[in-house]
Amino acid sequence: MPKRGKKYLEAAKLVDRFKAYPIAEAIELVKKTNIAKFDATVEVAFRLGVDPKKADQQIRGAVVLPHGTGKVQRVLVFAKGEKAKEAEAAGADYVGDTEYINKIQQGWFDFDVVVATPDMMGEVGKLGRILGPKGLMPNPKTGTVTFDVAKAVQEIKAGKVEYRVDKAGNIHVPIGKVSFDNEKLAENFTTIYEAILKAKPAAAKGTYVKNVTITSTMGPGIKVDPSTVAVAQ
């Protein structure tokens, strides 16, 4: 394990590692234990009872957080003609076709999200080995392969986040910054929690949400009691 600094150890003393806190209390603790000198990101980690090795237990999707993440997302759109104009009008940072494919192949990555129209995927597919490992490959499940490029760009700019289960059965999602009001962080948390509950694979057996932890960029993890979260039925 990496050696922890004095500030981290002092912050960690405020947290009972064996307790799952009500969401409101957990958010308050995230702020108290934040040791970063910058406006740290608040992230939630879900440990799920799924086997990601099985195709019918993969979880991937996207949801628009009501208060965004506090980060301005740079959006690259692969589109032509009218669709390119729509993407530009919606606020995309970069819009084009083959010229951006060449740039990426040469090591350009000044973007955070990639959107593509379906007719461009034949060309964009050439970037699979480059974009895939970085989690940047457009995908219909996350709404980033679509002809409605304007809606896709607007949602991303408004605070849309993607979630995807990793090989260990975990999902990590940013829900804002420590500077956010507690209520806004709680509402963002509830939104992503509801999305993950709805995404439960039919093949998943036993306890689905095993563990929920919330943390700031450099702070200690704080367990959350999911039963304290009011979710829509």
Curated annotation (Swiss-Prot):
Q: Tell me the keywords, alphabetical order.
A: Repressor, Ribonucleoprotein, Ribosomal protein, RNA-binding, rRNA-binding, Translation regulation, tRNA-binding
Enumerate the GO terms in the molecular function aspect. Answer: rRNA binding; structural constituent of ribosome; tRNA binding
User: GO terms for CC?
Assistant: large ribosomal subunit
Q: Where is the signal peptide?
A: none
> Which PROSITE patterns has this protein been placed in?
RIBOSOMAL_L1 (PS01199)
Which BP terms does GO give this entry? regulation of translation; translation
Keyword Methyltransferase found: no
User: Which InterPro entries does this one have?
Assistant: Ribosom_uL1_bac-type, Ribosomal_uL1, Ribosomal_uL1-like, Ribosomal_uL1/biogenesis, Ribosomal_uL1_3-a/b-sand, Ribosomal_uL1_CS
PANTHER family per the UniProt record, alphabetical: 54S RIBOSOMAL PROTEIN L1, MITOCHONDRIAL, LARGE RIBOSOMAL SUBUNIT PROTEIN UL1M
Function of the molecule? Binds directly to 23S rRNA. The L1 stalk is quite mobile in the ribosome, and is involved in E site tRNA release. Protein L1 is also a translational repressor protein, it controls the translation of the L11 operon by binding to its mRNA.
Tell me, how does this one assemble?
A: Part of the 50S ribosomal subunit.
Protein family: Belongs to the universal ribosomal protein uL1 family.
Write the protein's name: Large ribosomal subunit protein uL1
Source organism of the structure: Geobacillus sp. (strain WCH70)
